[in-house]
A protein has these predicted regions:
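Active-site lining segments that contact anionic ligands and/or coordinate catalytic metals
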Residues: 32-34, 84, 197-201
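Short, contiguous, pocket-lining structural segments
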Residues: 54, 86-90, 121
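Flexible, active-site-adjacent loop/turn segments at secondary-structure boundaries
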Residues: 35-40, 85-87, 103, 141, ...
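Function-dense linear segments that define catalytic or interfacial modules
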Residues: 1-81, 91-101
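Internal maturation/activation junctions in enzymes
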Residues: 55-78, 104-205
Length: 205
């Protein structure tokens, strides 16, 4: 049951209400949201010499932000941030890239491209979040109750459906690593073993 979430709605991050007495003292500390956001530039990412390394570097940078965001003036935000380690990595410049490639916005090729692009963002943020969890021995709060922990989150990816299909989109991603079903299965097993550091990772703000 979702009782609260942030109003910007670029990310669905669950909050919990606090219980406060008449003296304005916490009887039960709730959790609120710190928006630790960043954005990839689609044009630049598609010409990056190493797409995955670029995303992993962004995850490290945003992890520093979330680890450093101690908003003690609002204890519920500090509490929620320390439990979830949340960031939101998104994208800007999609229309610019499609125009550059003479692909009509909303065409089948544009939809296919966007699906693959965000699949790669998802994959590489998961990879690095798992690496950080393994290094630190820390996962986000209640990781063990998540679909990441039991592996079912990865089912749609281990089916091998998320690969470029049209010749045009294959051309756009030429030279960029596209994870196979086996790669997703390997990542699933690593996440089940060592967890994820971040509760949320993606947001288009």
């Amino acid at each position: 049951k979702i009782i609260m979430s942030n109003l910007c709605s670029e990310i669905l991050q669950v909050q919990e209400p606090s219980l406060i007495n008449d003296a304005q003292e916490f009887l039960q500390m709730g959790t609120d949201v710190s928006c630790n956001l960043g954005s990839t530039n689609v044009v630049n990412m598609m010409t990056s010499p190493d797409f995955g390394r670029s995303i992993r570097a962004m995850v490290r940078a945003l992890t520093f932000v979330t680890d450093s965001s101690h908003i003690v003036a609002v204890p519920t935000i500090d509490h929620g941030n320390s439990q979830a380690h949340t960031f939101g990595l998104g994208a800007m410049g999609l229309h610019s890239y499609l125009a550059q490639q003479l692909i009509e916005y909303g065409s089948p090729e544009s939809v296919e491209f966007t699906s693959i692009y965000f699949m790669l963002l998802n994959y590489w943020t998961l990879v690095e979040s798992n690496n950080i969890a393994r290094e630190r021995g820390i996962t986000f709060h209640n990781f063990e109750k998540s679909d990441y922990a039991n592996g079912t989150y990865f089912d749609k990816y281990t089916s091998g459906q998320f690969v470029p299909k049209s010749d045009r989109v294959k051309e756009l991603f030429e030279g960029i690593f596209i994870p196979s079903a086996a790669d997703w299965a390997e990542l699933r097993d690593k996440v089940k073993a060592d967890g994820l550091y971040h509760q949320n990772r993606l947001a288009v703000a």
